[in-house]
């Protein structure tokens, strides 16, 4: 396939279609694909003409895609551009290639475009490039490196061009396209919509006619757009063959919900003689003023300029250039645009006062900055430092270790960075420092702190100090900013300076005792201790003979391994391969995995295998529905064909649907005059056109309902709601009790209610027409689901065991009561702490429902029966004899290291290499003095012979040493020494152990670091006043080997400055970190509110903060657009939104909306929630969207998230652009919310949270600006404030409840939709207070809460 068919030529003029009700108008944009503003900006930075540049890129160039330090395909490929979809294509040139479908890269995913010459000679890194013997022989100016990805770790296209000029052209062109595509200001929302639709048009169109066939639309709508579309609706908006404009028009028709505008903004619409309903410029200004509280409304010139940028000059104008208008659909698009974001763009600049001491700021900080994934096997990468710095991180970590020495000399030639004693790869310190120098001040000009985790010998430390000085040069801070200072300098005073954090030699003495003093607040996790070797080995269970993977840590006197298993076959999913070698075919959209030619399978009218007589019976059962009642079934006489059964004048007629092969494709028809590609299209055609036979002439009007074999089943209840279902399930004491019912809010939706671990879980069964999709398996009816999961795990090891309904419940409970021993059942779900037991000896279960486990492991007990307990070990759940375990009393349950690892003492052991039938490379460890007794031994297996040799040699050496000194263990670590050269570079961040006696001393330049679990103890010892004067850094427990993160909120609330997180992990803590540091221009420094700097500050008693300004925040979640999971092919999502305030313990609260079934394209919620926030200056608001349907062990319900500081959001009708787990913006995915903010008493309206809640922290230039805030509710707001959340719903447009009442008294949720029994707990705004039950220690007061189950 030639790329010429993939997109328009460079000279073509792109047109798109938008529509009002019944009207269409065309929009044109510049032929080079740039918006006007971005075109002018880019022309200033590039000497080449963009039109010619992009024309050359669209024509294409020959390249080889190469790989570093691995084999690669030397065949030439064609690299081409489609400027309108913003995609580049890599297509094989061989005409005989079987798979000639191009590899596609979306430019919005590109992070950097650099030539190899730029990396080697400008950034000055050698890294892997100099190690590759093939690459060093090529011209570095002809190699282009494209870094891309939507996570932290990046992938790469490394392309070798035929000439330097071609490489330079693509480097400049892609860089400019990347900046225009990714930059929030130069890619307006209408242009983003055009690109989105054009991309999908290219992926669906046929090269033969440059059109999309109707048969591809339903899979596209159900999979890509995530919308359960009805056949008649699709027929109305689509054509048999659609060009780009028709495809765009059809897609937009499906996206828009007319009621969204009519229920809220009808007063803004005016009739236009040619364009139907429009929003005039004057009404748009009225909207900005009255509903958005936007200062833009008062400046007509700026408002015009804003619309110019948004609509790109000529799109919005219907005549008078000074009186632009927009259609209703365009106005709704604007509501969901990022130009209308909840985020206040004034915070894109540095607005905080940056002249305060460093200890007054939170500082964005990274842990293990060099890692792309977990702490055992992942790759160390220079790009991780670049990415962290570009994200605004200001404190990065360097784990430094001795590198190579000169041959025959003790002098070191390099220092390496990696995670010591593990299989993580190594990178050179000098390369890292070059990258830091290059990227340190691109995003922010404020100081960067290097946290040196020094594991080097003293000679290597001298080299470390020399490389810091040589490479960082003038950026490196080596002298105080002011010799007379009595406190830490400010970020402004340290602009473009790099600060070294390290221990420092004592000034007055060579005695190093103070330096090596043990810090009780450091990480005590075993995996973090200094060791000889660390890695993953398999260990054999001597009873079950099963092999499991564990992390082993070798010390001089013992070998330890973590009880938690480590699966080397399944590395961290968050880690992205850095090879970028992904020559894979693009997935084609298919609804629920069904191909276009099989789309009839999901339709209500398709009945599959059904005999002629049975078909007649089914139709006559519903004959009251009248003529045109029909069904399609498999033909009994002609295998592979189908038959139509239809009701006409009380009689059932059967008509054969014929098929024939045309151009190697199967076609379907009744008559030769109409032939269709698919059965679905054929039936859809005759739902709008007459089918004429010898006996009748009629339209297929009503699908015959599917049979309902579930109605008389013992597990089905037609009347039970959520509460009744839980009441019935509670009568059955066993897990696995279940029933299926209809949803209280939608009778077409079925819900499975199931008892799991003593709790009641409710699953909405995902349905597409006649089929159900459960755990990615397809079922034709409910009976099949129940039969399938009757003896298979549905969730958490539970199958559907005990069917329940109103009719049979008494009989079932009598049977269970008779079979059980009375009084010995114990449900543990309500205990504050889990009951745990230690295995006294191993147990190997013989039945499927029994639990197997080795000795000395911890088992979570779920239930007890006489002689038999049920528990969970790892991911397994089952029954086991209680005599094999000993219960651990609650007060003795310990989280210490003794409970998470086992120890093999090396003293007196025999190390042998043996041959095992199960595994190669096996090492046996046994006691050397036990020859005939039933001795205990360990069998360990390595993944390779070389790895086994390494472990065996280390074990031999250490065992010999330990056996000669049985009574004396080797010292764990030698006295630490610090090179004077390195000590001299440490000025402000002098690392010392935390000492309560020194909190108030004058050593402001000292700082402490401590592990996350020590926060409680440190707060008790005076951490809060310490943090107002000196710096502190928190880092994760060493046991977090997957690089998962801890909650940073307790540490921020305690005033800790550098809360170091693993930036490579896209989890909730990192999302909160990204959201918090959006503020203050994303510079990485946030000024704390004044009340956190006082001596009496106490996060648990915020009521006494006189300087805090308590507020009431109302958030109505109106709707969403383009919501989908990452795996779109696994069904249409049913989204719900979780809204959470995270901050001080008293403020933390979460609400959840109801679930909208099978609609990710344009769901509507209309639910309002109220938050009372005592300390809004430190609070974050988090939106989290999930699929409410997803169940199963390998499913990810995540749809999107967004986090904003409460003091940085705008009021009014605003969009919430959603992001992925790594806080990268998703394409067009957003929520629409209505946000109102006022004083907690409800008397003062807050128009701008940024200026009002940040007032005491703003720089003078911003603080002196005139702000209208804290006013009484203005007169022009009265009409809106008299409208409650219920007023603006789609269901009830008129209601007289006043907004003033809402602001002053509303607690919980005002749900404008049907609040039937099933959703009452959600719709009423059921909350889960974050402080909840009183905790025993300070840290737990800040733990994340969970929303209430619904």
Curated annotation (Swiss-Prot):
GO terms for biological process: phosphatidylinositol metabolic process; phosphatidylinositol-mediated signaling; phospholipid catabolic process; positive regulation of epithelial cell migration; release of sequestered calcium ion into cytosol; sleep. Residues 832-890 form the SH3 domain. Residues 31-40, 1283-1329 have a biased composition (Polar residues). Residues 982-1092 form the PI-PLC Y-box domain. Signal peptide: none annotated. Residues 9-20, 1340-1350 have a biased composition (Low complexity). SUPFAM superfamilies: C2 domain (Calcium/lipid-binding domain, CaLB), PH domain-like, PLC-like phosphodiesterases, SH2 domain, SH3-domain. It catalyses: a 1,2-diacyl-sn-glycero-3-phospho-(1D-myo-inositol-4,5-bisphosphate) + H2O = 1D-myo-inositol 1,4,5-trisphosphate + a 1,2-diacyl-sn-glycerol + H(+). Residues 605-704, 715-804 form the SH2 domain. Disruption phenotype: RNAi-mediated knockdown causes sterility resulting from impaired spermatheca dilatation causing a defect in ovulation, and a severe decrease in sheath cell basal and peak ovulatory contractions. The few embryos laid are arrested at the embryonic stage. Cycles of posterior body wall muscle contractions are prolonged and arrhythmic resulting in a defecation defect. Ca(2+) oscillations in intestinal cells are arrhythmic and the whole cell current amplitude is severely reduced. This is 1-phosphatidylinositol 4,5-bisphosphate phosphodiesterase gamma plc-3. The lineage of its organism: Eukaryota, Metazoa, Ecdysozoa, Nematoda, Chromadorea. The gene is plc-3.
């Amino acid at each position: 396939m030639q790329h010429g068919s993939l997109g328009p030529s460079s000279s073509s003029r792109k047109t798109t279609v938008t529509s009002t009700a019944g009207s269409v108008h065309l929009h044109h944009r510049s032929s080079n694909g740039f918006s006007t503003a971005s075109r002018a900006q880019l022309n200033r930075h590039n000497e080449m003409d963009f039109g010619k540049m992009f024309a050359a890129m669209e024509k294409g160039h020959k390249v080889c895609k190469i790989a570093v330090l691995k084999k690669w395909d030397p065949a030439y490929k064609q690299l081409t551009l489609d400027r309108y979809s913003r995609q580049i294509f890599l297509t094989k040139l061989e005409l005989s290639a079987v798979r000639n479908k191009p590899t596609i890269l979306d430019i919005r995913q590109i992070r950097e475009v650099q030539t190899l010459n730029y990396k080697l000679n400008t950034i000055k890194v050698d890294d892997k490039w100099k190690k590759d013997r093939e690459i060093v022989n090529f011209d570095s100016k002809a190699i282009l490196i494209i870094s891309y990805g939507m996570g932290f770790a990046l992938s790469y296209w490394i392309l070798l061009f035929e000439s330097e000029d071609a490489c330079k052209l693509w480097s400049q062109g892609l860089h400019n396209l990347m900046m225009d595509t990714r930059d929030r200001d130069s890619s307006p929302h209408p242009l983003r919509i055009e690109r989105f639709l054009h991309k999908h048009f290219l992926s669906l169109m046929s090269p033969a006619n440059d059109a999309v066939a109707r048969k591809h639309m339903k899979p596209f709508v159900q999979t890509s757009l995530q919308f359960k579309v009805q056949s008649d609706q699709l027929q109305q908006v689509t054509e048999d063959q659609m060009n780009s404009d028709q495809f765009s028009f059809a897609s937009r028709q499906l996206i828009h919900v007319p009621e969204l505008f009519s229920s809220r903004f009808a007063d803004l619409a005016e009739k236009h003689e040619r364009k139907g309903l429009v929003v005039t410029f004057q009404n748009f200004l009225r909207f900005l003023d009255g509903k958005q509280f936007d200062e833009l409304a008062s400046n007509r010139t700026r408002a015009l300029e804003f619309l110019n940028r948004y609509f790109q000059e000529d799109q919005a104008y219907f005549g008078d250039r000074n009186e632009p208008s927009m259609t209703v659909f365009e106005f709704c698009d604007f509501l969901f645009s990022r130009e209308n974001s909840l985020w206040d763009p004034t915070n894109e600049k540095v607005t905080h006062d940056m002249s305060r001491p460093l200890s007054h700021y939170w500082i964005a900080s990274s842990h293990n900055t060099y890692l792309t994934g977990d702490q055992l096997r992942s790759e160390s990468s220079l790009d991780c430092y670049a990415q962290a710095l570009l994200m605004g991180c200001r404190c990065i970590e360097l784990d430094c270790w001795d590198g190579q020495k000169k041959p025959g000399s003790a002098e070191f030639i390099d220092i390496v960075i990696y995670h010591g004693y593990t299989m993580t790869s190594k990178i050179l310190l000098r390369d890292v420092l070059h990258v830091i120098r290059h990227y340190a001040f691109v995003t922010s000009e404020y100081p960067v702190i290097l946290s040196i985790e020094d594991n080097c010998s003293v000679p290597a430390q001298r080299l470390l100090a020399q490389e810091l000085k040589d490479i960082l040069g003038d950026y490196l801070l080596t002298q105080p900013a002011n010799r007379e200072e009595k406190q830490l300098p400010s970020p402004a005073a340290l602009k473009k300076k790099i600060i070294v954090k390290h221990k420092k030699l004592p000034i007055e003495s060579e005695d190093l005792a103070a330096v090596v003093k043990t810090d009780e607040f450091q990480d005590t996790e075993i995996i973090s201790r200094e060791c000889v070797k660390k890695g993953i080995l398999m260990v054999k269970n001597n009873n079950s003979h099963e092999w499991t993977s564990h992390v082993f840590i070798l010390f001089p006197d013992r070998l330890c391994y973590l009880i938690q298993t480590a699966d080397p076959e399944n590395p961290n999913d968050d880690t992205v391969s850095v090879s970028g070698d992904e020559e894979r075919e693009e997935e084609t959209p298919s609804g629920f995995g069904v191909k276009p030619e099989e789309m009839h399978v999901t339709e209500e009218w398709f009945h599959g295998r059904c005999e002629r007589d049975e078909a007649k019976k089914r139709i006559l059962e519903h004959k009251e529905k009248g003529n045109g009642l029909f069904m399609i079934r498999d033909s009994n006489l002609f295998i592979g064909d189908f038959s139509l059964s239809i009701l006409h004048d009380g009689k059932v007629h059967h008509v054969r649907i014929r098929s024939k092969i045309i151009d190697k494709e199967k076609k379907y028809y009744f008559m030769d005059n109409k032939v269709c590609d698919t059965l679905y299209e054929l039936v859809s055609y005759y739902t709008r056109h007459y089918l004429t036979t010898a006996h009748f002439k009629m339209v297929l009007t009503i699908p015959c309902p599917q049979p309902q074999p579930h109605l008389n089943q013992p597990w089905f209840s037609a009347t039970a709601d959520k509460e009744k279902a839980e009441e019935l399930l509670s009568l059955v004491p066993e897990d696995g009790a279940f029933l299926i019912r209809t949803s209280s809010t939608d009778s077409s939706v079925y819900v499975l209610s199931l008892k799991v671990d003593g709790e009641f879980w409710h699953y909405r069964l995902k349905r597409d027409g006649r089929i159900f999709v459960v755990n990615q398996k397809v079922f034709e009816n409910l009976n099949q689901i129940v039969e399938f999961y009757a003896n298979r795990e549905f969730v958490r090891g539970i199958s559907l065991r005990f069917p329940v309904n109103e009719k049979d419940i008494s009989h079932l409970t009598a049977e269970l009561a008779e079979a059980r021993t009375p009084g010995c059942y114990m449900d543990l779900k309500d205990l504050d702490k889990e009951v745990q037991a230690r295995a006294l000896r191993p147990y190997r279960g013989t039945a499927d429902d029994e639990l197997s486990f080795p000795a000395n492991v911890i088992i979570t007990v779920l239930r007890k029966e006489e002689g038999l307990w049920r528990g969970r070990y790892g991911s397994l759940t089952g029954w086991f004899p209680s005599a094999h375990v000993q219960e651990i009393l609650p007060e003795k349950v310990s989280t210490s290291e003794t409970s998470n690892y086992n120890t093999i003492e090396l003293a007196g052991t025999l190390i042998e290499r043996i041959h095992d039938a199960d595994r190669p490379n096996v090492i046996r460890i046994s006691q050397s003095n036990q020859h005939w007794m039933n001795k205990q031994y360990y069998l360990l297996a390595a993944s390779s012979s070389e790895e086994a040799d390494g472990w065996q040699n280390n074990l031999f050496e250490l065992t010999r040493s330990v056996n000669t000194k049985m009574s004396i263990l080797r010292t764990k670590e030698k006295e630490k020494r610090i090179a004077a050269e390195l000590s001299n570079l440490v000025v402000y961040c002098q690392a010392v152990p935390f000492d309560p006696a020194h909190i108030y001393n004058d050593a402001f330049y000292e700082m402490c670091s401590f592990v996350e679990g020590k926060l409680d103890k440190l707060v008790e010892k005076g951490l809060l006043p310490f943090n107002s004067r000196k710096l502190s850094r928190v880092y994760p427990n060493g046991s977090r080997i997957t690089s998962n993160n801890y909650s940073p909120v307790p540490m921020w609330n305690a005033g800790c400055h550098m809360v170091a997180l693993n930036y490579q992990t896209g989890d909730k803590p990192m999302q909160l970190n990204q959201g918090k540091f959006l503020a203050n221009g994303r510079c990485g420094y946030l000024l704390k509110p004044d009340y956190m700097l006082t001596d009496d500050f106490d996060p648990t008693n915020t009521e006494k903060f006189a300087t805090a300004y308590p507020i009431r925040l109302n958030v109505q979640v109106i709707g969403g657009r383009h919501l989908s999971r990452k795996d779109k092919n696994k069904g249409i999502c049913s989204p719900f939104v979780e809204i959470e305030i995270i901050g001080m313990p008293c403020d933390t609260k979460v609400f959840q909306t109801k679930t909208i079934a099978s609609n990710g394209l344009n769901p509507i919620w209309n639910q309002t929630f109220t938050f009372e926030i005592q300390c809004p200056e430190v609070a974050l608001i988090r939106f989290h969207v999930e699929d409410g349907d997803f169940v199963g062990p390998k499913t990810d319900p995540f749809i999107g998230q967004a986090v904003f500081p409460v003091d940085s959001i705008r009021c009014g009708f605003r969009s919430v652009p959603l992001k992925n787990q790594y806080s990268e913006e998703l394409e067009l995915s957003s929520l629409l919310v209505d946000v109102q903010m006022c004083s907690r008493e409800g008397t003062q309206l807050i128009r701008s949270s940024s200026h009002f809640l940040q007032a005491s922290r703003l720089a003078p230039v911003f603080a002196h600006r005139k702000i209208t805030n804290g006013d009484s509710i203005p007169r022009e707001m009265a009409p809106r404030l008299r409208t409650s959340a219920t007023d603006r719903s789609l269901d009830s447009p008129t209601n007289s409840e006043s907004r003033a009442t809402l602001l002053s008294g509303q607690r919980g949720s005002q749900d404008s939709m049907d609040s039937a029994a099933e959703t009452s707990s959600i719709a009423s705004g059921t909350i889960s207070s974050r402080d909840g039950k009183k905790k025993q220690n300070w840290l737990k007061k800040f733990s994340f809460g969970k929303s209430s189950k619904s």
